[in-house]
């Protein structure tokens, strides 16, 4: 049996350091928000042939120095939605873009729609994204508060906070773009981390009812080992799928898959070393669980 709790204090100190560092980065360096949140110009483009790839199209727009460029397929395989930071949809500016694009890929495209994404729409989108993340956290925490004792709930809260803050801190450190797909990834991370934590907590509570003579330090270690095969299988299979998306999914999915990879790694780690450490430090015992059962 692996003794996961042998170095739990050391891992706790490392986590505290990383969380504080991430918070400092988020406060003073901030996040690199993409066009979705900063506003810019939106172009709906249709290619008239199948030879031009999305990578060559992206390269052409990046070379125009338009700021952050986001290109996505929608509808048919020849339709693309292009967003970039430069806020100028005047006829002269659009004509220059058309000329540059013609030089790069030829005259085989049509601009079906051109419009500005204003700062008001972007700020509302950012506000909605923040509300979505906060609501998802609140619902998850409400669920675990009902299902488990308050000590377990506190452990889950700290584990979730740890995972989300470290993921955002990583994006801040390396100045990676934050767009709507990253928001979706963060929401998924919340669910994944909570699921991992609940599986171990469920086994801890079950073992607390069965063994009255085993201290919580040993009991959490037993519970982690009993659920280890499930944790490894779930984490490894999820990571393999995400790595495939990151390598072969193209530029559009790189940010999303990277955020998810970080979330899976942090979520697996926190369910073992953060959530369970709270139970150890609060010295949860069989009396705690039985008292709650009687209530």
Residue ranges and their predicted role:
Residues 1-295:
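A structural signal for conserved, well-ordered secondary-structure elements
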């Amino acid at each position: 049996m692996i003794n996961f709790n042998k170095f739990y204090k050391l891992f706790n100190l490392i986590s505290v350091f990383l969380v504080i560092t991430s918070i400092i980065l988020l406060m003073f360096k901030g996040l690199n928000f993409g066009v979705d949140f900063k506003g810019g110009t939106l172009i709906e483009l249709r290619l008239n042939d199948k030879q031009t790839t999305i990578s060559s199209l992206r390269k052409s727009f990046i070379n125009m120095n338009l700021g952050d460029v986001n290109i996505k397929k929608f509808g048919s395989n020849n339709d693309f939605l292009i967003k970039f930071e430069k806020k100028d949809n005047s006829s002269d500016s659009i004509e220059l873009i058309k000329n540059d694009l013609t030089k790069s890929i030829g005259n085989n495209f049509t601009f079906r729609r051109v419009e500005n994404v204003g700062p008001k729409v972007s700020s509302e989108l950012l506000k909605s994204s923040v509300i979505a993340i906060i609501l998802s956290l609140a619902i998850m925490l409400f669920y675990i508060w009902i299902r488990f004792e308050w000590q377990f709930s506190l452990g889950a809260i700290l584990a979730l906070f740890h995972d989300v803050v470290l993921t955002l801190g990583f994006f801040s450190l390396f100045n990676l773009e934050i767009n709507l797909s990253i928001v979706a990834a963060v929401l998924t991370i919340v669910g994944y981390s909570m699921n991992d934590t609940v599986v171990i907590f469920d086994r801890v509570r079950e073992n607390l009812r069965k063994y009255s003579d085993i201290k919580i330090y040993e009991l959490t270690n037993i519970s982690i080992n009993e659920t280890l095969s499930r944790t490894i299988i779930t984490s490894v299979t999820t990571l393999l799928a995400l790595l495939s998306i990151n390598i072969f999914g193209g530029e559009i999915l790189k940010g999303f898959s990277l955020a998810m990879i970080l979330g899976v790694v942090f979520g697996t780690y926190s369910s073992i070393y953060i959530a369970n450490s709270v139970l150890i430090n609060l010295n949860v015992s069989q009396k705690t669980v039985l008292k709650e059962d009687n209530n």
